[in-house]
Amino acid sequence: MSTTPNIGFISLGCPKNLVDSERILTELRTDGYNIIPSYENADLVIVNTCGFIDSAVQESLEAIGEALEENGKVIVTGCLGAKENQIREVHPKVLEITGPHSYEAVMKHVHKYVPRPERNIYTSLVPAQGVKLTPKHYAYLKISEGCDHRCTFCIIPSMRGDLDSRPIVQVLDEAKRLADSGVKELLIVSQDTSAYALDQSKENQNKTVFWNGAPIKNNLITLCEQLGSLGIWVRLHYVYPYPHVDDLIPLMAQGKILPYLDIPLQHASPKVLKAMKRPGAIDRTLERIKKWREICPKLTLRSTFIVGFPGETEEDFQMLLDFLEEAQLDRVGCFKFSPVEGAVATEMADQVPEDVKEERFHRFMQVQQRISAARLQQKVGKTLAVIIDEIDEEGIIGRSMADAPEIDGVVYVDNLSEQEVKVGQVISVSITNADEYDLWGTC
């Protein structure tokens, strides 16, 4: 009697990589493999790596090393897989290495070392939406792969290639399957969400296709309109500040997609932005933010910035602080510039000393924490829609429309009414308190 082969799986990195992991796991289950959470009984281990910054590379190499030590049969995929020589130098015993989104190659290698079972007992158990690594009530939906930008601090295009948008009908079909399976929130991800379909010819962008019996065009605005028809929360991430992003704001004001924009601005000094190869018209950005908020007063703006970029002077940094004060962003992440092997910025002159980076990082965070706290304080006394993530003996933990999972704050809810609630449910919460990150309230 043959036994079902076991595959161990390690997923590292960002939400885009998580989606790749879900795709591979779905194919493994469809082919009849059993997925297990341990090295000990695995016939083979797959490590889906990250290679964005040096610390991520180190984490990936350590994970590969642990898998080799504990199991011995390891296949590597993901972003770091694009640098096969670097992996082989450290771990020559790895069986096979593939780059990111190489699903077919991964499965081919799995079949080579662990033949698929003759009798597949799992096919009927694979859900229509595929295997998901997120809680049942939210899911990441990747709409494109790769990036056409060449930001000097980033090596993603060298690992994931140029922009490659998925067909709009394929994206919408997956979104509908997720919604039909009980997903209440879709998190739209890619390397550059606002570039969706721009890699296609004008003819293809304007070509009429049909979905749900209706004619649609192949572009981001149409995609968001159709996603908004599913009756669930739709949250946009990684939105590069193209001019047509302005056209998304009315959809948010109308309630078709969440009034939430994750738009990585990276800096505010024109000189630094030019060195980064990022858009540098910061005054125009402030004008757009003002206009967006006029159209959609409930808009939440999230952004990320880099301090200590090569050549950043105290004057440049002060421009960044001044921008924070004027823009009054709701949610902000800050990173100290980290040299990445292969990135143009790593070889630039005028590298900023680590102690200066650290000092600027703390000054940045002090300013933004004060701004964030003040903006959250404005929500005290209001009633917000909150999606429930957890329920325990201490109460409810959820998120408002302004909070993406894992990167933003949460809402702690005291269920004074003792109403029956469940994870994934959207409830009305009266906000009673706030700090610089989180909210507290009652229902």
Swiss-Prot record:
Q: Which residues bind [4Fe-4S] cluster 1?
A: C14, C50, C79
- One GO cellular component term noted in the UniProt record for this chain: cytosol
Q: Which NCBIfam families match?
A: 30S ribosomal protein S12 methylthiotransferase RimO (TIGR01125), MiaB/RimO family radical SAM methylthiotransferase (TIGR00089)
- What PANTHER family does the annotation carry? RIBOSOMAL PROTEIN S12 METHYLTHIOTRANSFERASE RIMO (PTHR43837), RIBOSOMAL PROTEIN US12 METHYLTHIOTRANSFERASE RIMO (PTHR43837:SF1)
The Swiss-Prot or TrEMBL record describes its family as follows:
Belongs to the methylthiotransferase family. RimO subfamily.
Keywords, sorted A to Z: 4Fe-4S, Cytoplasm, Iron, Iron-sulfur, Metal-binding, S-adenosyl-L-methionine, Transferase
Q: Which residues form the TRAM domain?
A: 377-443
What InterPro entries is this protein classified in?
A: Elp3/MiaA/NifB-like_rSAM, Methylthiotransferase, Methylthiotransferase_CS, Methylthiotransferase_N, Methylthiotransferase_N_sf, NA-bd_OB-fold, Ribosomal_uS12_MeSTrfase_RimO, rSAM
Q: What range(s) does the Radical SAM core domain occupy?
A: 133-374
Q: Which GO terms describe its biological process?
A: tRNA modification
List the Gene Ontology MF annotations in alphabetical order. Answer: 4 iron, 4 sulfur cluster binding; aspartic acid methylthiotransferase activity; metal ion binding; protein methylthiotransferase activity
Name the cofactor(s). Answer: [4Fe-4S] cluster
- Annotated binding of [4Fe-4S] cluster 2, by residue: C147, C151, C154
Q: What EC class is this?
A: transferase
S-S bridge residues: none
What does the record give as the function of this protein?
Answer: Catalyzes the methylthiolation of an aspartic acid residue of ribosomal protein uS12.
Q: How is the cofactor bound?
A: Binds 2 [4Fe-4S] clusters. One cluster is coordinated with 3 cysteines and an exchangeable S-adenosyl-L-methionine.
The cellular location(s) given in this protein's UniProt record come to: Cytoplasm
The residue ranges of the MTTase N-terminal domain are: 5-115
Q: What is its EC number?
A: 2.8.4.4
The record's Gene3D superfamilies line, in alphabetical order, gives:
Methylthiotransferase, N-terminal domain (3.40.50.12160), Nucleic acid-binding proteins (2.40.50.140), tm_1862 like domain (3.80.30.20)
Its UniProt entry gives the catalysed reaction(s) as: L-aspartate(89)-[ribosomal protein uS12]-hydrogen + (sulfur carrier)-SH + AH2 + 2 S-adenosyl-L-methionine = 3-methylsulfanyl-L-aspartate(89)-[ribosomal protein uS12]-hydrogen + (sulfur carrier)-H + 5'-deoxyadenosine + L-methionine + A + S-adenosyl-L-homocysteine + 2 H(+)
Give the protein name, as stated in the record: Ribosomal protein uS12 methylthiotransferase RimO
Could you tell me which Pfam families the record lists for this protein?
Radical_SAM (PF04055), TRAM_2 (PF18693), UPF0004 (PF00919)
